[in-house]
């Protein structure tokens, strides 16, 4: 006769083992905690949504608290996404936001510096206030976010990723754009400097250089969009097509394409890459490395 134990093994345990073997693999970013600035619209929103879809818990950070909350709720419950208002020009607000991220999810190990703005003016029309604001938001703001999140990552001793959303303008000179281009160039060099410093802690620092991301953009929704349309002599709602037309691939760059590049860097396939950047511009020859 068959023992009760053998009956159990035949009828139950083998079946359960088969079920376990058929379970889907964990998502690529499971157990990662991402802090995304400028996440209420455009590129930042697309990145936050993509990282969450790949398994990460996400802090949706933006100075527009209501919009950030809408994005977080759209992603999912507070077990997955939490909105944290933050103006990156404020050192104190950044410190508080990182602390809230740690409180919400137990740590931070994936940081996206996306917050930005632009005021396009000629050199003679660019005021000190114009210059200071763009550097405070992008150069200084990303420095502060990187510094405060690095404190956490070093203490965690688990490594991590910092990604800067810079711009094609970081490497291509264009007229009537001095403050924005200089701030983006600052961000691009922060990538290299921080990569050199943080490698010993297992923290990788990389950048993305997009170009012409009009759809859903908070930057293009303001005076920047009007100015660029006037500068290029096109209708505002045709800006995306215009930018696509001057690229090698003749394809418009959307926020989701930038999010794809971020995931490529942090999804586990490029673990030996740091201090570099990925252009997401459909091919802009003047931006080629040289």
Annotated model-derived regions:
Residues 122-123, 127-135, 243:
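Substrate-binding pocket helix/loop in short-chain dehydrogenase/reductase
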Residues 124, 172-178, 200, 250:
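Active-site loop immediately N-terminal to the catalytic Tyr-X3-Lys motif
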Residues 146, 183:
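Active-site helix of classical SDR
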Residues 151, 196-197, 271:
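Alpha-helical segment proximal to the catalytic Tyr-Lys
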Residues 167:
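Residue(s) in the substrate-gating loop at a strand-loop-helix junction
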Residues 199, 204, 273-275:
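Short, small/polar-rich loop/turn modules that mediate ligand/substrate recognition or access, typified
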Residues 270, 274-290:
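Short C-terminal tail/terminal secondary-structure segment
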């Amino acid at each position: 006769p068959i023992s009760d134990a053998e009956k159990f093994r035949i009828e139950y345990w083998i079946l359960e083992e088969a079920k376990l073997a058929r379970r889907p693999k964990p998502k690529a970013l499971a157990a990662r905690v991402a802090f995304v600035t400028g996440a209420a619209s455009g590129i930042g929103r697309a990145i936050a949504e993509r990282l969450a879809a790949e398994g990460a818990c996400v802090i949706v950070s933006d100075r527009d608290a209501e919009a950030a909350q809408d994005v977080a709720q759209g992603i999912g419950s507070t077990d997955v996404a939490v909105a944290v208002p933050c103006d990156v020009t404020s050192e104190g607000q950044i410190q508080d936001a990182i602390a809230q991220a740690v409180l919400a999810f137990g740590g931070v190990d994936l940081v996206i510096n996306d917050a930005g703005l632009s005021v396009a003016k000629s050199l003679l029309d660019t005021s000190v206030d114009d210059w200071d604001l763009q550097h405070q938001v992008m150069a200084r703001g990303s420095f502060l976010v990187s510094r405060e999140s690095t404190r956490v990552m070093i203490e965690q001793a688990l490594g991590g990723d910092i990604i800067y959303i810079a711009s094609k303008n970081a490497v291509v000179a264009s007229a009537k754009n001095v403050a924005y281009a200089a701030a983006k160039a600052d961000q691009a060099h922060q990538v290299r400097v921080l990569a050199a410093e943080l490698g010993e802690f297992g923290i990788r620092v990389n950048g993305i250089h997009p170009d012409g991301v009009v759809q859903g953009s908070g930057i293009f929704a303001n005076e920047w969009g009007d100015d660029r349309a006037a500068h290029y002599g096109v209708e505002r709602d045709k800006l995306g097509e215009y930018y696509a037309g001057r690229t090698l691939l003749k394809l418009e760059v959307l926020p989701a394409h930038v999010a794809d590049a971020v995931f490529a860097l942090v999804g586990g396939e490029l673990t030996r890459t740091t201090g570099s950047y990925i252009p997401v511009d459909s091919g802009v020859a003047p931006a080629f490395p040289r």
